[in-house]
Amino acid sequence: MSQVILDLQLACEETSGLPDEALFQRWVDAVIPPFQEESELTIRLVDVAESHELNLTYRGKDKPTNVLSFPFEAPPGIEMPLLGDLIICRQVVEQEASEQGKPLEAHWAHMVVHGSLHLLGYDHIEDDEAEEMEGLETEIMLALGYEDPYISEKIAE
């Protein structure tokens, strides 16, 4: 049986109204086990200032972002279940959900799914990579009972 050990860190000033730990666990359990038997990851929920600082330091982008993924790379020959860390900015997620007319819980789920796929090595820099990753995100979100997170983009095409 596959198992995902989740370390949820609440590093944002306002913690009321956040999804509970059971939801975060459900979301990572929907993504990771098909790819990796045993896994450990940290999800850190932060405010704008920390997201902005990390995004500037590690991506060179001078603004906060919704989710940052920091994969863990074990030294050669050492097997470790540690996947890495997700840093999710509460205010950015809430603002995006509002602007995009998406249910807040669904957008939180999408950020966890999206970030977890990055930890597993997926990316969306090239078009073919983006198509594969977005397809997986959609499949997982539908399996979780949420709408396709890219439906508005598909309708616009």
From Swiss-Prot:
Q: EC annotation? A: 3.1.-.-
Cofactor, how bound (note) = Binds 1 zinc ion.
Tell me the residue numbers annotated for binding Zn(2+). 114, 118, 124
What Pfam families does the database record attribute to this sequence?
YbeY
Give the Gene3D superfamilies listed for this entry.
Answer: Metalloproteases ('zincins'), catalytic domain
Q: Biological process (GO) annotations?
A: rRNA processing
User: Keywords assigned by UniProt?
Assistant: Cytoplasm, Endonuclease, Hydrolase, Metal-binding, Nuclease, Ribosome biogenesis, rRNA processing, Zinc
Subcellular localization, as worded in the UniProt entry: Cytoplasm
The protein's GO terms of the molecular function aspect are: metalloendopeptidase activity; RNA endonuclease activity; zinc ion binding
* InterPro entries, per database record: MetalPrtase_cat_dom_sf_prd, YbeY, YbeY_CS
Enumerate the HAMAP family for this protein.
Endoribonucl_YbeY
Query: What does the sequence similarity comment in the record state about its family?
Result: Belongs to the endoribonuclease YbeY family.
Task performed by this protein: Single strand-specific metallo-endoribonuclease involved in late-stage 70S ribosome quality control and in maturation of the 3' terminus of the 16S rRNA.
Q: What is the official name of this protein in its record? A: Endoribonuclease YbeY
Q: Which organism is it from?
A: Klebsiella pneumoniae subsp. pneumoniae (strain ATCC 700721 / MGH 78578)
Higher taxonomy:
Bacteria, Pseudomonadati, Pseudomonadota, Gammaproteobacteria, Enterobacterales
Gene (UniProt): ybeY
